[in-house]
């Protein structure tokens, strides 16, 4: 009987020990939505002539910071990107990220690329046009 009790106690303690040593892997960032305060026309966001600002809105889970980059259209333009802003999570319930960018050029034909940073990186892109 003593051996049986010892075996049960040992099994009970061993099962807790293995749970303690298991690694918890945080979920990677996930972009739920990425939009602007202007409507899309196909795959392009049409910026009205004379508009001076544009607001970018991102809803993302498992994300600490969102980086907002602007870069020209075309191939192999990643090295030409410019950081136009970032937003940092304010609390654990905060899944909304946004910036307002001041447009300082008369025309646009660019990509806005976002990176959601957390335990990994998620990416998304929208296209801007203004003639």
Task: Identify the meaning behind each predicted range.
Residues 4-13:
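Sec-dependent N-terminal signal peptides
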Residues 21-49:
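Short, compositionally biased P/S/T/A/G/V-rich stretches that sit at domain boundaries
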Residues 89-100:
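Aromatic sugar-binding surface patches on proteins
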